[in-house]
Amino acid sequence: MGEKVVVLIGPTAVGKTKMSIQLAKRLNGEIINGDSMQVYKGLDIGTAKIRQEETEGIPHHLLDIKEPHESFSVAEFQTLARSLIKDITKRGKLPIIVGGTGLYIQSVIYDYQFSDAPSNDLYRQSLERCSPDELYEQLKQIDPLSAERIHPNNVRRVIRALEIYHCTGKTMTEWLKEQKRQLVYNVALIGLTMEREKLYARINQRVDQMIDQGLIEEVKRLYEQGLRDCQAIQAIGYKELYAYFDGMLTLKEAIEQLKQNSRRYAKRQFTWFRNQMPVQWFDMTDDTIFERRVNEILHYIEGKFHFQSNM
């Protein structure tokens, strides 16, 4: 088994950032971002990216490494995160991956080989003659989950997903799910959960806070730069307000849609994590026992790795 790695997962707004700082302080850890949208510069408020003053001196990696117009793939994330795990471990620190993008996190800790996906040159050439819109429409029909992750203009990735379906009869989502997977690290997989009613209330409250903190102005800056056909703008919080700036929605409708999409995303995250990985769950519904939960998680990690934290 490889290096020791803590993975902290959970749906949006469950409290991962606050918990990750406490764990990193007591475990001599460094944090690796595991959210596919926090890699983008300028997408700060809408992605709930940690602010410098909130880090409490804990090093954070894989934040702000891409311009909004650039694409970012799960294979690229895998390479960068694994390199960081090696580097952080070599310096005597503990890598802690924190985030909500399930496939990205899975790709790092399991032995995913993206190059093993089947291919068909003739079929690919026939797809390359189609327009991006035609390709994306095909993908939406056969694999809506992949269509949510892949921007319509990321033609290479859309074609890859269609190619896998053509060769195997399985969607890329199903194909990845069925790969025989082995953990490549000694992993402590921690999940934070919360009663749905409270989580949804927190999500709604967080959206209101984002608006107060300047989300509309943040999205307007991107909109005015002409950034439109790029992966970053598909993020929840950005696509809804783009519809407002395009005159398709009123501001009230855009904000309501943002809340609804965030709640749906949280539900999908829960489903993914519960079905895909052997997670040790900790319920964060009761705010008054936060410190007790920190200690319970530390105790679990100590048992898993056989070492003592700075509790």
From Swiss-Prot:
Catalytic reaction list: adenosine(37) in tRNA + dimethylallyl diphosphate = N(6)-dimethylallyladenosine(37) in tRNA + diphosphate
Keywords: ATP-binding, Magnesium, Nucleotide-binding, Transferase, tRNA processing
Binding locations of ATP: 10-17
Site feature location: Interaction with substrate tRNA: 101
Domain of life: Bacteria
Keyword Transit peptide: no
Xref: Pfam families: IPPT
Segments for region (Interaction with substrate tRNA): 35-38
EC code(s) of this entry: 2.5.1.75
Cofactor(s) required for function per UniProt: Mg(2+)
InterPro entries xref list: Dimethylallyltransferase, IPT, P-loop_NTPase
Subunit description: Monomer.
Identification of the protein by name: tRNA dimethylallyltransferase
Source organism: Anoxybacillus flavithermus (strain DSM 21510 / WK1)
